[in-house]
């Protein structure tokens, strides 16, 4: 299974130009600041937005190509979608919510209910089959939304901030459950998140989008070790310094000089990790640090 997507779209102030590829058994996390285009990418893949230019194919089947006048409606795409706030229908029972996607695809009511009940059993929700979503906890609501997305046997599963609606107390346990459920799904999985912890815990690969462009991609370890933009550095909790290296010294645009190790001459990026910083008072601190600066501490965040 392979997703190949080249998406070009202008939507308000957003100019989206990205290329994505995903494979079976892979969890890809899309990260980026608000307004970067992450959720819009999911909407284009799901058929909720048509691309302005580009091409989307799933397993070699083209579902969106304006040049060829091809556009498959959402219900005709082999996709499951877990929305950020789960979007469960309050007027339907839990069983009817899960069956909704099947019914929209023309599956007979009896068969849709049978398949939906199977998923309720798998996700330990059978006791809630005939209750309304209002009685569900955040974790239970997420499992219902996941069951609704998976009951149609999709090839591609889209998850938009699947843990954002949860409070801090339940987030960790639900994250563990979600990881197990994703591992049992053998299709392609694409997840939007703002949280690097979620990305590290759930994703095999990270794609960072800023201002409608992919600025970095790689494994969580690679992205964390080598942030390429200020946003990525802030995301993974390091300080990013840009400048030009000559003879082992990086000089920034403001004239600050940083001694660095193992870098060729020329423009480069350097990272300073919080655990590498030593703060002292007085005329100096005895250490083996290659760099030292004088300054005034105005605030300290205790993490």
Labelled PLM ranges:
Residues 31-33:
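The feature captures the beta-strand-to-loop junction immediately N-terminal to the Walker
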